[in-house]
């Protein structure tokens, strides 16, 4: 299976561990465990969380090194997981259920969100399109087939009874192609939505956070092999990731959180504030996954045409409960 390489990959050993390692024999330093983490696109909350955990040296506190890969969509990230090029990825929970039917043995191990906070179907501000039904036979941007943007595009078609052409462009291609007129609309996620709204370059046709019924919309995912062979590394990885999230959500860290989000996403502070207040603070603090949430996620997937799915019970494990690193 061919893996499309990410535009950015960093092997990061957090500073506290690095400093401590200077006093250790070279052979001991060479044995540090590396965990390969994949996220679906750059300007997206799992990237913010993972980068924050790295910058706060939380992986080092757990005794591991994090190698972060930013892919060009959820489908590419899942392909990497299937090929053994990633240990842990963030993706839509239903991707696990679909993958199981294709022989990709993996599980959702920790939930991230119960809604598409900050996700919208948008058009340019000066677009003549005022209603979703006016997108009939038009071009609508998504990151990749099978991604969260694809699921929401298909949901919009089913819910509003309209058909349009879904155009996969990767996370970095959505905004430029919308603004250039190559797209009539696009499914977009925060903080890109907030930036475009504040800049008055786009307006919303659908607020998916309000329109779509609540269900498990995101999860950290690991292969069965990684779960079985390296459970403590997986536990440590989740501890660090949720430590990063809790750091961002803590009101005492608000100024630093806004600064981190602005730096990581390369956005102005006012847009970083919108991302923090309207999205990050709403994310799951404990990584819980309940069967009812997973069932609803699969119902959502079936609604948009994903029919060959493993059961909810087969698609997740509750064996790992994040203990946020501080």
Residue ranges and their predicted role:
Residues 10-30:
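N-terminal export signals
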Residues 1-6:
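Secretory targeting signals
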Residues 56, 62, 80, 84, ...:
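Structured segments of extracytoplasmic/periplasmic soluble domains
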Residues 94, 172-261:
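Pocket-lining segment of extracytoplasmic ligand-binding domains
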Residues 298-326:
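Conserved C-terminal helix/tail region of periplasmic/extracytoplasmic solute-binding proteins
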Residues 31-160, 165-169, 173-177, 184-188, ...:
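Short, glycine-/small- and polar/acidic-enriched structural segments
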Residues 228-307:
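Secondary-structure end/capping motifs
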Residues 57, 61, 210-212, 281-290:
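Short, solvent-exposed loop/beta-turn-alpha elements that line the ligand-binding surface or hinge
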């Amino acid at each position: 299976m061919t893996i499309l390489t990410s535009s950015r990959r960093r092997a990061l050993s957090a500073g506290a561990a690095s400093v401590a390692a200077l006093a250790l024999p070279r052979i001991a330093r060479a044995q540090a465990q590396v965990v390969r983490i994949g996220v679906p696109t750059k300007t997206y909350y799992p990237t913010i969380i993972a980068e924050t955990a790295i910058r706060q040296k939380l992986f080092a506190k757990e005794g591991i090194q994090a190698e972060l890969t930013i892919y060009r969509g959820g489908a590419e990230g899942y392909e990497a997981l299937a090929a053994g090029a990633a240990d842990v990825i963030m993706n839509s929970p239903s991707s696990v259920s679909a993958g199981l039917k294709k022989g990709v043995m993996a599980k959702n191990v920790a939930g991230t969100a119960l809604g598409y906070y900050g996700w919208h179907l948008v058009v340019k501000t000066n677009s003549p399109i005022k209603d979703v039904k006016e997108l009939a036979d038009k071009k609508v941007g998504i990151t990749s087939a099978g991604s969260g943007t694809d699921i929401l595009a298909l949901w919009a078609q089913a819910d509003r009874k309209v058909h349009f052409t879904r155009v996969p462009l990767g996370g970095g291609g959505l905004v430029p192609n919308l603004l250039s007129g190559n797209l009539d609309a696009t499914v977009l996620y925060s903080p890109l939505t907030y930036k475009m709204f504040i800049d008055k370059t786009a307006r919303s046709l659908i607020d998916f956070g309000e329109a779509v019924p609540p269900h498990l919309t995101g999860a950290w995912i690991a292969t069965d092999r990684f779960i079985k062979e390296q459970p403590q590394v997986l536990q440590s990885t989740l501890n660090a990731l949720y430590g990063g999230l809790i750091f961002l959500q803590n009101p005492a860290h608000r100024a630093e959180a806004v600064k981190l989000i602005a730096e990581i996403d390369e956005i102005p502070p006012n847009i970083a504030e919108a991302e923090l207040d309207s999205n990050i603070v709403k994310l799951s603090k404990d990584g819980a996954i309940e069967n009812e949430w997973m069932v609803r996620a699969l119902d959502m997937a079936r609604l948009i045409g994903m029919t060959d799915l493993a059961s909810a019970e087969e698609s997740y494990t509750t064996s790992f409960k994040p203990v946020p690193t501080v």
